Amino acid sequence: MPDSVLYPPAHAQPVAFTKEQLDWLPWLEPLEAEALTPRHMQALVDAARAKSPYFRLLARDPEVLEARTKTDKDIFYNPEGGLPRAERELAAAAASRFNGCIYCASVHARFAATYSKRDADVQRLLDEGVGAELDERWSAIVAAAVALSATPIRF
């Protein structure tokens, strides 16, 4: 592990929730792509992720990265049961909006809007928060995501 924090160059830091792609910069040095071992590549699950500084940073702990990536893939890409992809992304956007992660909210809101074709509703969630007025089904999904995020036992 590096013994110092990186200080990113001047850049526009997000101040509001958005569906736009945000400029993510690490606070710790990601591994160089050339330094990735076969174990790192296995943990990435998809070799294309080696191009991403985000995933190369997570690769510093291959066991955690592999568990995180397999969990992520199962949550969002598993076609055997569960909610449609748009609503999985909606739940993730709501959880991110609730816990205040502008970066994760932007990713999941973008996917929720793309898959659902309900851009205005997704934008309302971002603008107004998890109390935004949505239709009955989407409100139930948002409420469940918030309850699970707040305290799993509340769910």
Question: For the regions a protein language model found, what residue spans apply to each?
Answer:
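Hydrophobic alpha-helical segments
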Residues: M1-F155
